[in-house]
Amino acid sequence: MAKIAQGAMYRGSVHDFPEFDANQDAEALYTAMKGFGSDKESILELITSRSNKQRQEICQNYKSLYGKDLIEDLKYELTGKFERLIVNLMRPLAYCDAKEIKDAISGVGTDEKCLIEILASRTNEQMHQLVAAYKDAYERDLESDIIGDTSGHFQKMLVVLLQGTRENDDVVSEDLVQQDVQDLYEAGELKWGTDEAQFIYILGNRSKQHLRLVFDEYLKTTGKPIEASIRGELSGDFEKLMLAVVKCIRSTPEYFAERLFKAMKGLGTRDNTLIRIMVSRSELDMLDIREIFRTKYEKSLYSMIKNDTSGEYKKALLKLCGGDDDAAGQFFPEAAQVAYQMWELSAVSRVELKGTVCAANDFNPDADAKALRKAMKGIGTDEATIIDIVTHRSNAQRQQIRQTFKSHFGRDLMADLKSEISGDLARLILGLMMPPAHYDAKQLKKAMEGAGTDEKTLIEILATRTNAEIRAINEAYKEDYHKSLEDALSSDTSGHFRRILISLATGNREEGGENRDQAQEDAQVAAEILEIADTPSGDKTSLETRFMTVLCTRSYPHLRRVFQEFIKKTNYDIEHVIKKEMSGDVKDAFVAIVQSVKNKPLFFADKLYKSMKGAGTDEKTLTRVMVSRSEIDLLNIRREFIEKYDKSLHQAIEGDTSGDFMKALLALCGGED
């Protein structure tokens, strides 16, 4: 079994088998493979129930008893993916890694993803064992083989990682952290070109503890996460390797949870990746991987394997998984503490919000007004000029252009634009030309017009706007539609959902910091209303009102503390419990508030992704988010989008829209990540 650090808790899913008898197991395997056909059920049941150390003893005893190589017999009797999985389980981990790397660099082409996964994630000790195992198994030098099969900075970083010399100090020098941040910044963002050697040296040698502090300081200093700089400064396999290293520094289990999800999502399964990870992590951190997988993807690893594989192969993988975490949102007690600590860190870090559209330099409203008039005069319309001007001016500058246009030509720019452009492009351009509060007011009005109500739009706007933005929306709504927003919401919605929306529409959310004592009380209210408290108290109607008050009026910093206390109190994530225990519009509203508090840019990244995935595009949502966030946090949304969906927002827009609408959206997007 894997060696456990003193005082550490074992987080693998496979344990030493009690009352283990290597002779008896060797005999059982021999019997299972004797005669015509083989008893695959017995083979998988036995091998997946033994630790790696015990399997090595079985191999030895099998050879002593029968004079045969157990692995060779298994290869002969089994086939396909099931054979690969069982044979990998029978090898010591270092030899399993060595075989994977040998396969990755043999023949035509190189499996760079396999090289990256193994070399970015292994500890110093595991790396030394890998090098020795490779030498023993193939009588070749691993470093020489990697140098012969790779090139450039990618090769250099692989060689650095292969040395297994990452620092292990728990004591971190603040001065060295600051120096490394400065060196990385100067090597990338501040340099014409990139000094890759600095990235290789720092990310390849510093301790994990040190690098986590470097990443935190880098974000504070530059306003962007280290991943964004890597994507901007590096490219190709080298970029992928460095991003994998950063992910493993931050959280190795999260890195593998992502790899497993990507191995099974979409059409087809990447079985080699699935096998490699399930085998290599089964005695290290599978419980942590399972927990992160469930929290991140809202489904258990067990259920995804069950739905994506079949036969004995599936049964063996499920045994390695070790259990189905079907209580969505519930943390293992140990993982709850990790989640609690993550909230502590997120409370400390302050991410600077940045839009993609800012005020144009050398702004000349007179010239812009004339250019727009020319673009719309005569036969045909010059859409390119309209897009270029409107998407590259701030909203305040656009209002000046509107005023100047009227002063010069005695015409309403909005009316002229309406008559010259149409469809999705018109919705986008006209939205950009409106003051933000009036634009939001119009979106709310449209959501309540006609038959049926667009609850999703009401929730999206009211759950995410600041107090100042909400108050401005109220004024704009009254001015434009001669009716208060509250009256409109009252007449168009009902019940608890109406109360939530009206509460949000008052714009009276507290704006102070956290109150720890109050946070504990609020967490208890949440636990009681969501029916997971040990000692529920008070009538349900009163609790519902208090819960609504907590989510709709407490400040964001305070609510983050409430969510943290909720985890501590219940071992559950509040978002998952709301999804499980509530329903309909009330559930959607509360989930939106929680997601906005946790990470508002990620909330909007999800909205954008869902507006473009699957058959057809939800152009209205796509337009609304791109218009409303372009000067606030669209750059942050872009970063969250690529981090979660493994493709850039730019790529998603390019693949899902077309023509002038696409050009205008890409201009707002502000660049490719």
From Swiss-Prot:
Q: What is its main location?
A: cytoplasm
Q: Where are the Annexin repeats?
A: 20-91, 92-163, 175-247, 251-322, 363-434, 435-506, 521-595, 599-670
* A single MF term (Gene Ontology): calcium ion binding
| Modified sites of kind Phosphotyrosine | Y30, Y201
Function statement? May associate with CD21. May regulate the release of Ca(2+) from intracellular stores.
Record-stated family? Belongs to the annexin family.
What's this protein's name? Annexin A6
Which species does the entry assign this protein to? Mus musculus
